[in-house]
From Swiss-Prot:
It comes from Salmonella newport (strain SL254). The keyword Iron-sulfur applies. The keyword Oxidoreductase does not apply. Pfam families: FeoC. The gene is feoC. Iron-sulfur cluster binds at C56, C61, C64, C70. This is Probable [Fe-S]-dependent transcriptional repressor.
Amino acid sequence: MASLIQVRDLLALRGRMEATQISHTLHAPQPMIDAMLNQLEIMGKAVRIPEEADGCLSGSCKSCPEGKACLREWWALR
């Protein structure tokens, strides 16, 4: 079972990561990692870094059938 401290330490070691990467590295369920990251954000220890939409090939994510699923979200320590 992963702990909040392990998530924080992993972000400290790797710099920035996606929640799915953290989940796989710590062998923890994705919803649990999401909750831990949100808690770290509330505590002011972590920051969410959304990927810019300028990487979209067509430039029209609103009309994309995937919605904004192609946009990645990174996490890093403050």
